[in-house]
Amino acid sequence: MGKVGAGGGSQARLSALLAGAGLLILCAPGVCGGGSCCPSPHPSSAPRSASTPRGFSHQGRPGRAPATPLPLVVRPLFSVAPGDRALSLERARGTGASMAVAARSGRRRRSGADQEKAERGEGASRSPRGVLRDGGQQEPGTRERDPDKATRFRMEELRLTSTTFALTGDSAHNQAMVHWSGHNSSVILILTKLYDYNLGSITESSLWRSTDYGTTYEKLNDKVGLKTILSYLYVCPTNKRKIMLLTDPEIESSLLISSDEGATYQKYRLNFYIQSLLFHPKQEDWILAYSQDQKLYSSAEFGRRWQLIQEGVVPNRFYWSVMGSNKEPDLVHLEARTVDGHSHYLTCRMQNCTEANRNQPFPGYIDPDSLIVQDHYVFVQLTSGGRPHYYVSYRRNAFAQMKLPKYALPKDMHVISTDENQVFAAVQEWNQNDTYNLYISDTRGVYFTLALENVQSSRGPEGNIMIDLYEVAGIKGMFLANKKIDNQVKTFITYNKGRDWRLLQAPDTDLRGDPVHCLLPYCSLHLHLKVSENPYTSGIIASKDTAPSIIVASGNIGSELSDTDISMFVSSDAGNTWRQIFEEEHSVLYLDQGGVLVAMKHTSLPIRHLWLSFDEGRSWSKYSFTSIPLFVDGVLGEPGEETLIMTVFGHFSHRSEWQLVKVDYKSIFDRRCAEEDYRPWQLHSQGEACIMGAKRIYKKRKSERKCMQGKYAGAMESEPCVCTEADFDCDYGYERHSNGQCLPAFWFNPSSLSKDCSLGQSYLNSTGYRKVVSNNCTDGVREQYTAKPQKCPGKAPRGLRIVTADGKLTAEQGHNVTLMVQLEEGDVQRTLIQVDFGDGIAVSYVNLSSMEDGIKHVYQNVGIFRVTVQVDNSLGSDSAVLYLHVTCPLEHVHLSLPFVTTKNKEVNATAVLWPSQVGTLTYVWWYGNNTEPLITLEGSISFRFTSEGMNTITVQVSAGNAILQDTKTIAVYEEFRSLRLSFSPNLDDYNPDIPEWRRDIGRVIKKSLVEATGVPGQHILVAVLPGLPTTAELFVLPYQDPAGENKRSTDDLEQISELLIHTLNQNSVHFELKPGVRVLVHAAHLTAAPLVDLTPTHSGSAMLMLLSVVFVGLAVFVIYKFKRRVALPSPPSPSTQPGDSSLRLQRARHATPPSTPKRGSAGAQYAI
C-alpha cells in the first residue's frame, strides 16, 4: 500500500503557497535530495501523501504536532508561481502554523531584453484583459486594449501601505525558513541558508528576528555562534514562544533552545543525529526524536535531555497517545523491525520502555510500514495467501478485520481521514489501475460501504499516490472529487459525505458577460484537485473554516477536465453556483476571515500588483504593494485574527538579497463592522436547506460594506431536520438499486450478522440502511430505518472451524500455539467444547464467555497432529478437524478435483501449486472418513468411492517450513446428467477468476434455476469453471432422502433435464449481479452418465444387458449410417491438464438430437 494525497492545484508548474500563519520554508529545487530542506514528514503531520510504497497511508489530524518543519497541509490557502522558483506554503493542522517551500537558486538567466524589461517594471504592471472600471481599475483576468487607458490605469492605481527590508549579506543564500508567531505576538524569525549542490550540504546560515511585524530585522548570528551552521527551525505547536534550532549534522550535532521567542538561546550537545521530531499535542516539553540510525528517543525537557526508547523503529511509524483513547498521555505507539526483517506493533511509556514494559497490541507480525495511529483508530496490514488484509482497533479495543464488499479484493488501501468517528478510505480494487474507489465506514471502522467509484489518482515524484479528492473547509460532509467516466475526468460534489454526488453547474456567463452555453450532464465545470509536482506544494484550490461559503479554484468548462484553457472560478454559496474571475491562473488568500480575497497572478516576470475583492469575488480592484517589481518567492499571511499584515518574500533580481515586503491592509478599512453590516445566509444544496440533517444559517458581511470583520463568529443558528430517506446510506452488504432501495448484494447473507450471538443476548438486525455518520436529523423515518435490537435465537452448533491464531498450519516444537475455535452459529455460553490435540492430551470447556483468546497448547514432539474439536449443546452438535504440522510456508495450493463422478470409478486428484517449483514436497491426503492419511511424493493420486453421496478430500502440501492445504467436496452417484452453461458477455467484466467468486456465482445460478423451474435444489449442482469466457457445468443429480428411500429414477432425471433445457432455451434464467447488470444464462450442450459402467466388476446380468444394448445400437447405426452422423466425445489424453475448462471424461452409450438429453458415461467432470 502506498501513501495517498488529496489536495488542489495544477501540476503545470511548481507553485508557491500563501497561508494563514506560521512557518514558511523557501528552498532551492533539488534540495529535497539532500534532506536538508524537505525531510520526510511524519505521518501524524502528513494529510494525504507520503512516499513509502507499502503500508497504510493517512491524513493528519487537528491537534497533531508536526514531526518536522514540514507538516503537510490540510487545506491550501494561497499559491503563487514565481516562474522558475519552486515554493509551497502549508499550514500544520490544528497548530495555526503555516509552512512553505520555495526555490531561488534554480532561476534561469533571462535574456538581455527580458532583464531590461524586468528592471524597467514592464510586465509587472501589465494589467489583465478587459475594460477599465471605476478608479482606473480593470476587469480582472483580461488584457489591456487601449494604451491610453493602460497609462491612465498606472497613474490612478491604488496603493497599499508597505515597507521593504533587505536581508543584507545573504544574497548567496538559496533557502529560507520563516516563522511568524501570531496570537498577539509581533515576532518573526527567519533562517536563511546556503545549500551547496555539489557538496550536498549547508555551508552558511543566518538567523534574523523582527519584533515589529516585519518592519525591521536584527541578525542573531552572534547569539547562536558565528561559526554555527543551522539547518532547521522548529516551533513548539502548543507554545509558540519555545523555539528549537537544529545544527547541521555534517559539522556538529546540537540543539539551540529558546523560551523567549528566539531572543536568547542555550546550546545542548547531542550524541545522535536527528532526522525528524514529533511534538506532543498537549505537553509542550515532550518530544520524540527519530535518529538517522533508526532509533527513537524521547525528551520530557524540551530537548535538554534525551532517553532511548527503541531501536529498529520504522521511519515515520511512531505516534503519541491520543487523548480519549489512551489513558496514559506519555504512551508511545511505534512499529519496530526485528533482526529478521519482520515488523510488529509495540506500545510503551516514553520514560519506561524496557522489554518488560512493552506491550504488543496486535498479536504476531504486521506488514512493514503499515502502522497508523490516528484519532481513535489504529490500523495495521497483514498479507497472507498473496492478499492484503486490513485490521482496525477502535478506541484501543481488540483488532477486527476491516470488511469491504466481498469482491472488492483490494490491491491497495489508503486512510484518507478519520474525522467525526468515521473512516474515509481510498481502495484500489483488483480491476483498477489509475483510479480508486472511495469507501466510508461505520463508527468502529469495520464495515465499509461504497461512496464513489473510479476517483482519479496520480503518482507524485517520490512515488506517493495522490487522490483527486478535496474536503471543503468549514462545511461538514462536503467534498469535491474527480471521477473518471469512459476515459473522461469530471468533477463531482457531495454535501452528505458521499451518499449523493452531482456535477458542478458551470457559470451562466463569462468575464465579458457573454452567455456560456453549457448544459448538464453533457457540459459542466471541472476543477483541478491535484497538488503540485512538488510533494510539499499545495494546489490552486482554496477554502477556509472562517469563510464556509467561499471556494476558489482553477479549472475549465466543458465535457471533461483539461490541463489547457485554465481559468479561475469562485463560488460564494458553497458550490451551488460559480463565477469566472480570471482567465489565467492566480493564487488567492483569504484575508480578514474571508471578508477580503487577495489574488496574485502566476507569472515568471516580476510583479508589483495584486487584486482585492471585498464582495466574495464579484468585483476586483487592483493595488500595488511595492514600487519596484519583485520576483515573488513566497507569501506568509496573517497568523493572528486581526493583524491584517502579509509578508511577501522575493528578489528584485537574481543577484539581489532576499527582500521582505510587509504589506499592511488596515488602511483599506475605515471602521470595524457592526451588527447592521451583516446579513443571514442559509447553507443549501440546490435549494435543499437540510444538509447532514440540519439547517444552518451563517452570518455574512453585506457585499457593499467595506468594514473590518475581526474575529469569526461561526454559524448564527442551527436546527435539526426531520429524518428522511436521504439521511440514510446503504448498510454493509447492501447496494442501492435504481428505485432507490437498498437490497442485499448477491454475495451477502443478512442472517450472518447474528452468527456471533449467544442465547439471552441481542444483536442489531439491519434494515439495509444506516444513518450517515454525523448526520443530525431527528424523528421522521429514523425509527423505520434504524437497525433494531433483536434477541439472539437459540441455535444448534453449525459451521465449526478450528484454526491457529496466525492462520498457519504449523507450530514450533516447544512453543505455544494458539488454536481459535470459530462457530458460525450456536450458543457459545451454553456449549460443551472438547478439544483433542492429537498428542494424547485432551481438554474440555463448559459455558465459555468468549473464545476470542483462543486455546493455547505446547507440542513437545515434531509431527503431524490431528486436532479434533467437538461442540455440543442441547440443540445439536458439530465437529471440526485440523491437521497441524509441528514445523514449514508455501505460497498457494489448489486441489483440482471433479465436481461429480460415478460410483466405483477411479478419480484423479491433483494438487496445483503456486509457484510450481518449490523443491522437494510431501503430499498428505485425507479422504472420506479415514483416520489415517495417504502420504505421497507426487502431486496426483487416485481414489475410488464405493458409496453414493458427498465426499470430502483434503490435501496438505509441505515444503520446508511451509504447509498449505485445500479441501474439495465431490458428489458420487451411479448416474447423473450434465449440461454446459454459458452467459451473456457482460459477466466476464466482473469475473476476477478466483474460486470464491465462482462458488458464489454458482450459488446464484442454482437459486435462479430453482426459482424458474421449481426443481428442488437437491437435484441441482452448478459448478462455474475457471477462465474466460465464463462458463459453468450444470449437474442433475439423483437425490435420495437420508433414509435411502424415494430415490429418483432415470426417467425422473430425463424429465428434469428436459425441463431445465426448455427453461434455459426460453431465456427464462437470469440474475442481477449488481444494480443495472443483468446476466442471462444459456444452455450449451448436454451429456449423460451411465446406468451401468463398463468395468469387469459388474455382474453377469449387467454384462448381458450391456451387450444387448450394444447390438441394438449397432443395428441402428447401420440403418442410419448415411442419414445421421453421431459424434462421440473421446477421453482426453493423459497430458491434458486438470483445470482446463473443456476437459470432460465420458463414454456415450446412446446418441440423441442436441435438444434432448443424451445418455452415456461421464466418468468425471473436471474444473478448478
Curated annotation (Swiss-Prot):
BNR repeats lie at residues 208-219, 256-267, 492-503, 569-580, 611-622. The chain crosses the membrane at residues 1100-1120. It is found in: Membrane. Residues 38-69, 89-150, 1129-1168 are annotated as: Disordered. The keyword Magnesium does not apply. Glycans are attached at residues 68, 184, 352, 433, 765, 776, 816, 847, 908, 929. SUPFAM superfamilies: Oligoxyloglucan reducing end-specific cellobiohydrolase, PKD domain. Changing residue 223 to N: In a breast cancer sample; somatic mutation. One of its GO terms (molecular function) is neuropeptide receptor activity. Detected in fetal and infant brain and in fetal retina. GO terms for biological process: neuropeptide signaling pathway; post-Golgi vesicle-mediated transport. Residues 1121-1168 are cytoplasmic. One of its GO terms (cellular component) is membrane. Its main location: membrane. Residues 38-53 have a biased composition (Low complexity). Residues 111-123, 141-150 have a biased composition (Basic and acidic residues). Keywords: Glycoprotein, Membrane, Repeat, Signal, Transmembrane, Transmembrane helix. Pfam families: PKD, Sortilin-Vps10, Sortilin_C. O-glycosylated. Residues 1-33 form the signal peptide. Residues 34-1099 are lumenal. Residues 803-894 form the PKD domain. It is a single-pass type I membrane protein. Belongs to the VPS10-related sortilin family. SORCS subfamily. This is VPS10 domain-containing receptor SorCS1. It comes from Homo sapiens. The gene is SORCS1.
